[in-house]
């Protein structure tokens, strides 16, 4: 029997998880297994109310996790030409799930996005002034981000929902094509802009603890601080592949090869850090959870 931080055993929890085929959903199942938490993957489609109700009545969960959603393949540009499909899952589906959970008195942990902000005059690049949970989203450059900002605003009315703003997720699995490090290491050229990011190896276990504590409301679900593309690729070179090289290009040059603009921002992680004081800064977390476990070369001090 596994005990959580509050002393109650993990056997008293029973999680219903949506997003079985997704990256975060898959990792959540593995974490539940490791912690001895009973879990079931939902089989219903998010936008199909009856199938969600059937899942909940069958599983009788203590908490529900939503890691389902449309991000687009290979990237968010897909959403620009598949707007109805994007709305169906990211807006209608998420709201349906939140509404049913509220009816059933269940906390919903909703993995959302922080890609709904961009640096502005009040939060300039390099200033260390991050966007807070209560700030109004200011980035609608992509249809994906637009739908995510809409649904976040509506979910504020559901007191049972915990919205986690994930950004540029990274994990220790460098073979996963969704991993931000793997993505940028494969790009022909990359921009170099400091951003808030989410180290899943550290933060996903925290999200399980948030469910156990029945936390609700919006959280910037990122490690404190920012890291740039070049800083990550320098670590990749130093720890993984000393022969690795890359080329940079400007935002203007990037705009010519993508359909929708991308969000760049710093999120203020104070609220999460206050709840979880052990939370590591982005660069510390990258080294501990990603680069040290994957180290192939002796790193020069």
UniProtKB/Swiss-Prot annotation:
Pfam families: RmlD_sub_bind. InterPro entries: dTDP_dehydrorham_reduct, NAD(P)-bd_dom_sf, RmlD-like-bd. Keywords: Cell wall biogenesis/degradation, Isomerase, NADP, Oxidoreductase. SUPFAM superfamilies: NAD(P)-binding Rossmann-fold domains. Optimum pH is 5.5-7.5. It comes from the Eukaryota. One of its GO terms (molecular function) is dTDP-4-dehydrorhamnose reductase activity. It catalyses: dTDP-4-dehydro-6-deoxy-alpha-D-glucose = dTDP-4-dehydro-beta-L-rhamnose; dTDP-beta-L-rhamnose + NADP(+) = dTDP-4-dehydro-beta-L-rhamnose + NADPH + H(+). Optimum temperature is 30 degrees Celsius. Pathway: Carbohydrate biosynthesis; dTDP-L-rhamnose biosynthesis. Signal peptide: none annotated. Its EC number is 1.1.1.133, 5.1.3.13. NADPH binds at residues 23-24, 69-71, 111. One of its GO terms (biological process) is cell wall organization. Expressed in roots, leaves, stems and flowers. GO terms for cellular component: plasma membrane; plasmodesma. Belongs to the dTDP-4-dehydrorhamnose reductase family. Bifunctional enzyme involved in dTDP-beta-L-rhamnose biosynthesis. Catalyzes the epimerization of the C3' and C5'positions of dTDP-6-deoxy-4-keto-alpha-D-glucose to form dTDP-4-keto-beta-L-rhamnose and its reduction to yield dTDP-beta-L-rhamnose. Can form UDP-beta-L-rhamnose from UDP-6-deoxy-4-keto-alpha-D-glucose, but cannot convert GDP-4-dehydro-6-deoxy-D-mannose to GDP-fucose. This is Bifunctional dTDP-4-dehydrorhamnose 3,5-epimerase/dTDP-4-dehydrorhamnose reductase. It comes from Arabidopsis thaliana (Mouse-ear cress).
């Amino acid at each position: 029997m596994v005990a959580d931080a509050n002393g109650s055993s993990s056997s008293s929890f029973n999680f219903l998880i949506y997003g079985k085929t997704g990256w975060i959903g898959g990792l959540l199942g593995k974490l539940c297994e490791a912690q001895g938490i009973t879990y079931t993957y939902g089989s219903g489609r998010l936008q199909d109310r009856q199938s969600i109700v059937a899942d909940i009545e069958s599983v009788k969960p203590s908490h529900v996790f939503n890691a389902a959603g449309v991000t687009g393949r290979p990237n968010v540009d897909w959403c620009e030409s598949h707007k109805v499909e994007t709305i169906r899952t990211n807006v209608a589906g998420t709201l349906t799930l939140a509404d049913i959970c509220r009816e059933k008195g269940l906390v919903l942990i909703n993995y959302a996005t922080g890609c709904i902000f961009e640096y502005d005059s009040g939060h300039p690049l390099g200033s260390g002034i991050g966007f807070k949970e209560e700030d109004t989203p200011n980035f609608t450059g992509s249809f994906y981000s637009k739908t995510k900002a809409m649904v976040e605003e509506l979910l504020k009315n559901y007191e049972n929902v915990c919205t986690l703003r994930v950004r540029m997720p990274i994990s220790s699995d460098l073979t996963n094509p969704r991993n931000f490090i793997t993505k940028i290491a494969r790009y022909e050229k990359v921009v170099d802009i400091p951003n808030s990011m989410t180290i899943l190896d550290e933060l996903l276990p925290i999200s399980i603890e948030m469910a156990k504590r029945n936390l609700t409301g919006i959280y910037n679900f990122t490690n404190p601080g920012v890291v740039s593309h070049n800083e990550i690729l320098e670590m990749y070179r130093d720890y993984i592949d000393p022969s690795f090289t890359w080329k940079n290009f400007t935002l203007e040059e990037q705009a010519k090869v993508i359909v929708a603009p991308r969000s760049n921002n710093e999120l203020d992680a104070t609220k999460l850090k206050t709840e979880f004081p052990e939370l590591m800064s982005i660069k510390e977390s990258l080294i501990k959870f990603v680069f040290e476990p994957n180290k192939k070369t002796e790193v020069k001090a």
